[in-house]
Amino acid sequence: MRKIKSENQILIMLAFFSVSMGLWENFRQLWLQDNGFSATNISNIISIGTLISVVGIMFVGKHIKLSKLKTFVSCSLIIKFLNLIFILYLNNRGNMNLINISIIIDVLTGYLVTTSIYPLITTIIKNNTIYSKRKLTEYLFKDVGILVGGLLIGRSVIGILVNYNVCLFISIVFLAISILVMFNMSACKNIENKQGENVSIIKYILKSKLQVIYMIYSFIGAMAMSTALGLKMLTLTNYFKFSDNQATNYLLIVGLAADIIGILALKYLTPKNDYITITIKFGIRFIAYVIAFLSNNIIITLIAMTWSILISTSYENICDGYYVNEIDNKYQLTFTNFRYVIRYLGEATGIFLCGVMYEIGLRYMFGLSAFFLIFQIGLAYYLIYLRKKERYIQ
């Protein structure tokens, strides 16, 4: 039997983990709503969970060595598994405080695992293609999780009505499989500690103007995306009047289409001019958001939302891959964690703003996001300019 490559073993674990995440996260907002949480409550608790995740990621970057990363990921998976079982138990029991704590732990462990995957892979192989494969694996199998939920929600299976809590149970099963794959993984067992000693990642980044601008770009980009789409399921079910099944099917179809577009873009549809690539990814999104805001039309807003999701997985190699892979391997874990810290700070801010705008009106979610996109696009163009300038000097 042909031996599975080490990096592919990690991707297989990520696939099962992503199915679990996609299935549960798709219904988590509605599960919370069913348990008495308002949209503002939901955005606040997810924002708090994301901010606490930032602290956790900083701890990992400072104290967890590459040689111990596999063990850390395994422990995080187990904690997430036990916590989800507890959330399953808390359903409709009215204990809001315990639910708050459990959701924070759920968000925290999910982010800790997600941020640790690529540093594991870079100990084996590092290039723009494997970076995109890692991202596409996560996106694709999250959509598989959404598919599972969409096929089952509201149906009776062996006499059991599939509701949000049953979907949570199925999510736990996929998470258990990812844990088994992790325990049987031969990859990363004999990693030498390549992490630089006493590394100050902030000082390291500050030495590079390119990386400083990239961090600002990452923060604003995450904030812009989350401001418009931070509460997708609540937006679809409450503003667009989709049923939970219709909302799931919509996200599934658009998500799978986005995965296909991402794969095709990586192989065949990446323009030679990076400025054109950025314009396709973010410029059209900006125009769509502005039209949605000015028109205040529900159909136009849905089209803008759809385009944003469709293009979301495309051109990761251009928008992020270069800046990640420019970093020396011995700084990779620390840098990756710091990058996620910046990104999740932006995401937490965006989700909070999304909750505020959600209460004011749908158009304002997209209008505020369009405002942030102006800065994101400007920084993206400037990054390309700096990158080409560095290449010319070399």
Regions found by a protein language model. Name each.
Residues A15, M96-V113, F219, I300-S314:
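Hydrophobic core of transmembrane alpha-helices in multi-pass small-molecule transporters
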Residues Y275-E316:
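C-terminal transmembrane helical hairpin of 12-TM major facilitator-type secondary transporters
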Residues I104-K142:
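Cytoplasmic helix-loop-helix junction between adjacent transmembrane helices
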Residues I78-G94, G283-N296:
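C-terminal ends and interior cores of transmembrane alpha-helices
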Residues R2-I52, L210-L252:
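Helix-loop boundary and gating motifs at the non-cytosolic
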Residues G56-L69, I261-D274, Y358:
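Helix-to-loop junctions at the C-terminal end of transmembrane segments
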Residues M1-K5, A187-I216:
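Juxtamembrane intracellular "pre-TM" segments in multi-pass secondary transporters
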Residues N44-K62, I253-L264:
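Central cavity-lining transmembrane alpha-helices of secondary-active solute carriers
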